[in-house]
């Protein structure tokens, strides 16, 4: 039985099931030691956590572990007894520290003395130090960020394929692999997915995920404390380096100097390097040319904004974890209206479900509109004009614009006209009377009827819902 996989799966379920503050306070620091004769041994990092798990979460742990392993288990909580156990127990994914060390070339200069060419051999480092560093490394990977949980679409298909290739064949496919794109598009998810994939296949591989800010802070602290050898142990005795937001080292000379030598050491030793940034290497101003050229040695892939189908798939996957049911019409509505990055998509869905829970009401399009009123008002004002709506509706349904605005009531014109009424009410500040004037001088009660009819039917008519979504997408893409 793979205890690492069992515990990671259990933690993933608990992270979805429990409120975030409860998960972080009580569960995150625990670690599965063994399952023997139907008893799961879970290690708590301190007595406070041990007591909390025993008094609050034994039943939940039994249920979740039993569900994962496929048979009933009892749970026993034990206390970590040493510093190394406490650090290991604090790891998010509960992976055990690797037992062997891998040697590589460690020749870069460091300050204190920085830049003096003096090398501090890693061979003098104690096994205990290496074990502690490995335990801390594993804590930096989020077990929920896996390839299985990554929603693939045209905007990120190449990036996903490149990351999978690197995970399956480290230092053979693309080295370095450089991912770039705007915030909230899944770059960090892919970095974690690589690390989790590699460690699931071989827990002995030394994987380190850090942000460039952490790298810089570690460097500064090591120089101040005269612990540059510790810094080398952390960053150069690894097999895979995953470094996030590399753009933040721009303009920091010492950090760039040290990362240059770290890069060279790892690359020359055949170790895999994966880097993310919010822009391409050429667009990172004040980045040293020697670093820029090294970033371009391997493969550079951009991650783009998700399209409508990908946004819908992301929201659908997120909705499956929601504490309240989220109907498909609401998912479609959010995917149409929130056309930014993935974090905002997920944040909006969380806000809608929280709003519904707070008022103890089901999730509907009306509830979503109320919960996101400020955001939707801001996003909507991409200056969609009434004239643009009428043109898009007429073009979509292949009807004459004059007929759409006229008094005729033929069957092929009634539905497009009602859709136009609905979109004019939803996407502009036009009053019902103004909408009526645009559509053949109709009164406000007729407009209200048409709007309400479409609002009701899109909840049950999938075809109509798709038609309205397509028109909205065209409007948003053409808005200035």
UniProtKB/Swiss-Prot annotation:
Positions of the UniProt region annotated as Domain III, AAA+ region: 140-356
Region spans: Domain IV, binds dsDNA: 357-480
| Protein's UniProt keywords contain Cytoplasm | yes
- What ranges does the record give for the region Domain II, renumbered to this chain? 71-139
Q: Which InterPro entries match?
A: AAA+_ATPase, Chromosome_initiator_DnaA, Chromosome_initiator_DnaA-like, Chromosome_initiator_DnaA_CS, DnaA_C, DnaA_dom, DnaA_N_dom, DnaA_N_sf
A GO MF label: DNA replication origin binding
Q: Where is the composition biased (Basic and acidic residues)?
A: 97-108
GO terms in the biological process aspect are: DNA replication initiation; regulation of DNA replication
**What keywords appear on the UniProt entry?**
ATP-binding, Cytoplasm, DNA replication, DNA-binding, Lipid-binding, Nucleotide-binding
Localization (cell): Cytoplasm
- Note the Pfam families from the entry: Bac_DnaA, Bac_DnaA_C, DnaA_N
Which residues participate in ATP binding?
184, 186-188
What is its quaternary makeup? Oligomerizes as a right-handed, spiral filament on DNA at oriC.
Q: What is this protein called?
A: Chromosomal replication initiator protein DnaA
Look up and give the organism this protein is from.
Answer: Roseiflexus castenholzii (strain DSM 13941 / HLO8)
The gene it comes from is dnaA
